Amino acid sequence: MLRYAFRRIAGVIPTLLVIITASFFIVRLAPGGPFDQEQTLSPQVRANLDAAYGLDRPIAIQYCRYLRALAHGDFGPSFKQRDFSVTDLIAQGLPVSSALGITAIALAILIGIPLGIAAAVWKQTPLDVGITSLVVLGIALPGFVTGPLLALVFGVYLQWLPVAGWEDGAARYFVLPVVTLALPVIAYVARLTRSSLLDVFRANFIRTARARGVGRWRILWGHALRPALLPVVSYIGPATAFVVTGSLVVETVFGLPGTGRYLVQGAINRDYTLVMGMVIVYGTLVLLLNLLADLVYGWLDPRVRHE
């Protein structure tokens, strides 16, 4: 198991370096610059700003300088929000985004797995049909559709929850964004659990257990559930990536001060360092959670770690 873990951990650093390098050159080579929207600037003032931020240097030198600063934990200053460094903005937004993402994933697991189990145990019944219909609907509707719909129903018509904004410690501001972000993941986890559990029910060792008179629920909890959850565990990594990308839309729709909203603002304003900082944060989170999913999968399935 340790060798398997070291092998997985060793792949994280070069992957992160590729993400940093690709993001740096894509951002810098994109049309426009951080000061192009400021029409009142004279050419001399703009040249002075470029020199102050090192944007007048060749892109290869800018890249080397950025890596050197990054090695010391310095993400650089924000070009647009000049009173803040990128580290300050990450420190402000990361707790909000982390709480949003972790809660959405936890909600998806706590709801999606029981729904999938119920649909598999009572397959081809009205319960199965109802769950399957909701699953298809949840997968089909993207966050930028479900978010405004939920805000319209529960925020405007019923006035149960706020439709936007953020107050520290106020859970009611978190309900609609978390549900919006979690719904597609709940649907996919439920579908994956149902199909995987039905496959396990058709396996030879389950048939043997039934022939020996083992009860239905003992077969489910004692024999079938653990192997059926292996595909669900492997999906946690892609689900994390989905939640990360989905948070960009959700935080913008509901006005949450998270890293996703800062990333969107940075991309619009061509704030190079802010975009890079947020991309690195998101890339690191996705890689670490994928690593965690791989380790859990290897612990559950010995065949994987011995390959």
Task: Identify the residue ranges that each predicted region occupies.
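Alpha-helical transmembrane segments of integral membrane proteins
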Residues: 2-4, 90-127, 143, 168-307
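N-terminal signal-anchor/signal peptide hydrophobic helix marking the start
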Residues: 6-12, 16
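Transmembrane alpha-helical core residues of multi-pass small-molecule transporters
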Residues: 11, 19, 42, 107-108, ...
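Hydrophobic alpha-helical transmembrane segments of membrane transport/permease proteins
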Residues: 16-65, 80, 84, 158-174
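Juxtamembrane/transmembrane-helix interface segments of polytopic membrane transporters
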Residues: 19, 23-27, 147, 151, ...
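Membrane-water interface segments at the C-terminal ends of transmembrane alpha-helices
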Residues: 23-29, 66-68, 133-162, 180-184, ...
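Hydrophobic aliphatic residues
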Residues: 26, 30, 38-42, 70-71, ...
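An internal, D/E-rich "acidic patch" concept
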Residues: 56-113
